[in-house]
């Protein structure tokens, strides 16, 4: 039987339930709530009609009060307007909770883009073996970041979670109490979170959502796709930026990095302990229960007394496999699925739970490296190796960076950023020792604009008594010019024998990050996206020529202006000329709670990502490939839109408008993130230093989507005027 269209399902469940539960607000014991709920629709109607007539906001508000509430004092007017905001905020939370509750009804959990659909499609086209082969080599890497786009405090997110459960259970009394709780709960934070606070809030999603949803997917693949064959791939990697992302955040220290890594390990061990405790109630068989309880005890001791009781990952894996073997050999495989579920999760999450990435700006690295070379102890240690470094050309500087190594202590330096940069590398080694190599094995260089930017990090790793660093060095290309130069930079990197030797030790794979947010801020929507697409094609071709595998790590935000949108459709649309053995992307702030906040939404969206990568390889769609005419059209559109965007940015009042008319000055004053709204300490506003999030967010708050679409209309209109629009539509 055919399902109703999605919009009909949405109206039937979400909209109708919202109307029912929204009426509960009127029953809450708040003095002004009836007045607010009665006045709000009238006010909305005045706003709608006034906006249609082109009236400014002040005139609309004054007209409303003069006509409807003429006796109100200025204080009472302000109070009512503030009550409107409070009321609408809580209506939005209710709507979010109802959406979460109705997710499985509105979205087809077994439809297109899900693993079940993909498996059936592969089966019917005789591609099941091909699918298995591909799944053994394909990965999705979700990197959680604490970018400040989540305005809800943790207490409100908790209420949303409880509300969605209550609505699913049709518990009217509980829902009413939760709405009253919502009415008494602050929607703002008293103080800025620390980087560790941000890490803790995101670890909640790892513990309560991803641990189960990703585990379920791996379970499904083993049971239904691979069956008697073996899945030798964990499928998912989870990355983690809070506590490790130093780019523009002076509050991320080496101590915070280590503390965050310890918290990640503690959290995953706690999940293993809970799973073992649950297993002990089922696996009550002779010879099995003793093993489960012994393992449970060892995990408990490692959790709460790690210094005295160390636990090796290999031991945990071996014991679980022994328990599985006993179930099969002596107990007819009873509850085998439960022990396999835990085995898969241990393989997936190890002792690291999520891999911490370190990230820093290349300009900071450059300053740090200059400080290193001026240091007396370093000069004494390295001698002629670094002589005249600053006066040499880039080729010779890179030659030195490739050769130098040693044991430079952070204690050599009084400069804070230099000492902390080197100390962070020592912390990397410590995390790998405690949590396994995956605990922290990637170093991202933001604003990467040269070969030297990459080799400076390579040199610092080897100067930290780490001759063969177990670290993936990842250049992040963000601006339009850096994206255009990325291929020549990476080509020089691939022609460096010492670096290639390092790359071979890392599986002959180079990860390259591409920044959608800063790219769009720099060049506008069309130019940024087209430049990234072309960079991926060129870098894929280059990597193939050098027999190197390349993985693209996409720095994507929530809105289109920061690379957001329908992520799975984006990956579906990539042509066959782009290497895609991995999908790697950042998931930021509010996108985490909205797309991965519940078990159902998390599993659904993870499956969509997984199937989007598979689809391009197993069911090849040549319609995604662009021909010469398509490329010419895109080049022209991107160039025209870029010029319009650049001309707008060059307007003498552009920055003044941002500072004085939009919400930009308030971003730095909100308590939604630990990171400052701009890089550096300059008081004067500079687009180069301004973060993409406040830039995009400020335009968005003003209802002017400049970063998302400015210049696109100009380019499209040019084709329309010249009767060439069919070239755009083809």
Describe each model-derived feature in a short phrase.
Residues 2-233, 255-312, 356-359:
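Extended, highly charged
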Residues 209, 213-220, 224, 271, ...:
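Generic, well-ordered alpha-helical scaffold segments in large soluble proteins
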Residues 30, 52, 144, 169, ...:
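Intrinsically disordered or highly flexible coil/loop and linker segments, enriched in small
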Residues 122-128, 132-141, 217, 221-224, ...:
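Structured, charged N-terminal subsegments at the starts of enzyme catalytic cores
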Residues 133-136, 140-147, 164-187, 339, ...:
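Structured alpha-helical segments in the cores of large, soluble enzyme domains
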Residues 2-82, 100-120, 185, 234, ...:
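Acidic, glycine-enriched catalytic cores built around paired aspartates
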Residues 15-18, 173, 200, 204, ...:
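Conserved structured core elements
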Residues 254, 260-280, 464-643:
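Catalytic or ion-translocation cores adjacent to nucleophile or general acid/base/metal-coordination motifs
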């Amino acid at each position: 039987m055919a399902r109703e269209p999605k919009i009909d399902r949405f109206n039937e469940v979400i909209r109708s339930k919202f109307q029912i539960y929204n009426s509960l607000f009127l029953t809450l014991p708040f003095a002004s709530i009836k007045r607010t709920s009665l006045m709000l629709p009238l006010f909305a109607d005045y706003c709608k009609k006034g906006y249609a007539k082109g009236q400014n906001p002040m005139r609309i508000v004054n007209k409303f009060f003069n006509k409807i509430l003429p006796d109100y004092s200025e204080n009472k007017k302000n109070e009512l307007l503030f009550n409107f905001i409070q009321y609408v905020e809580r209506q939005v939370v209710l709507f979010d909770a109802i959406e979460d509750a109705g997710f499985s009804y509105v979205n087809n959990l077994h439809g297109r883009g899900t693993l079940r659909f993909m498996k059936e499609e592969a089966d019917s086209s005789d591609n099941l073996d091909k699918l298995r082969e591909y799944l053994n080599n394909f990965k999705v890497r979700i990197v959680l970041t604490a970018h400040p786009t989540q305005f809800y405090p943790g207490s409100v997110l908790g209420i949303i979670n409880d509300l969605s459960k209550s609505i699913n259970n049709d518990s009217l009394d509980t829902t009413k109490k939760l709405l009253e709780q919502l009415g008494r709960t602050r929607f703002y934070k008293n103080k800025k979170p620390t980087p560790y606070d941000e890490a803790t809030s995101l670890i909640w999603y790892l513990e309560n959502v991803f641990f189960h949803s990703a585990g379920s997917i791996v379970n499904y693949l083993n049971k239904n796709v691979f069956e008697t064959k073996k899945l030798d791939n964990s499928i998912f990697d989870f990355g983690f930026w809070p506590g490790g992302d130093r780019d523009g955040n002076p509050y991320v220290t080496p101590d915070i990095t280590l503390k965050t890594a310890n918290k990640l390990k503690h959290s995953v061990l706690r999940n293993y302990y809970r799973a073992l405790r649950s297993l002990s109630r089922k696996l009550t068989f002779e010879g099995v229960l003793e093993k489960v309880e012994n393992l449970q005890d060892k995990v408990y001791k490692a959790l709460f007394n790690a210094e005295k009781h160390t636990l090796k990952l290999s031991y945990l894996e071996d014991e679980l496999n022994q328990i599985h073997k006993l179930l099969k050999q002596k107990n007819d495989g009873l509850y085998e699925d439960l022990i396999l579920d835990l085995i898969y999760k241990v393989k997936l999450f190890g002792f690291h739970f999520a891999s911490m990435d370190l990230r820093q700006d290349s300009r900071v690295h450059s300053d740090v490296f200059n400080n290193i070379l001026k240091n007396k102890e370093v000069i004494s240690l390295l001698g002629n190796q670094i002589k005249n470094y600053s006066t040499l050309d880039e080729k010779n500087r890179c030659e030195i960076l490739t050769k130098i190594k040693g044991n430079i202590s952070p204690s050599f330096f009084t400069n804070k950023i230099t000492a902390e940069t080197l100390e962070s590398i020592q912390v990397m080694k410590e995390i790998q020792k405690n949590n396994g190599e995956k605990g922290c094995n990637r170093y991202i260089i933001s604003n990467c604009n040269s070969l030297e930017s990459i080799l400076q990090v390579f040199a610092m790793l080897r100067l930290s008594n780490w001759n063969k660093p177990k670290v993936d060095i990842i250049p992040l290309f963000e601006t339009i010019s850096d994206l255009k130069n990325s291929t020549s930079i990476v080509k020089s990197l691939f022609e460096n024998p010492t670096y290639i030797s390092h790359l071979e030790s890392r599986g002959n794979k180079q990860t390259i990050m591409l920044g959608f947010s800063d790219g769009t801020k720099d060049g506008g929507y069309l130019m940024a996206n087209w430049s990234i697409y072309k960079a991926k094609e060129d870098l894929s071709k280059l990597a193939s020529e050098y027999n190197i595998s390349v993985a693209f790590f996409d720095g994507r935000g929530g809105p289109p202006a920061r690379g957001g949108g329908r992520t799975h459709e984006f990956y579906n649309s990539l042509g066959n000329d782009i290497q895609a053995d991995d999908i790697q992307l950042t998931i930021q702030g509010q996108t985490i709670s909205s797309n991965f906040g519940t078990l159902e939404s998390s599993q659904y969206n993870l499956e969509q990502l997984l199937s989007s990568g598979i689809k391009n390889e197993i069911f090849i769609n040549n319609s995604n490939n662009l021909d010469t005419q398509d490329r010419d059209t895109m080049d022209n559109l991107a160039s025209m839109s870029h010029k319009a965007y650049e001309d707008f940015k060059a307007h003498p009042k552009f920055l003044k408008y941002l500072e004085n008319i939009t919400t930009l000055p308030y971003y730095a004053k909100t308590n939604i993130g630990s990171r400052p709204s701009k890089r550096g300490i300059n008081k004067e506003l500079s687009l180069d230093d301004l973060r993409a999030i406040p830039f995009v967010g400020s335009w968005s708050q003003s209802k002017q989507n400049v970063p998302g679409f400015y210049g696109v209309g100009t380019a499209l209109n040019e084709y329309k005027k010249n009767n060439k629009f069919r070239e755009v539509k083809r």
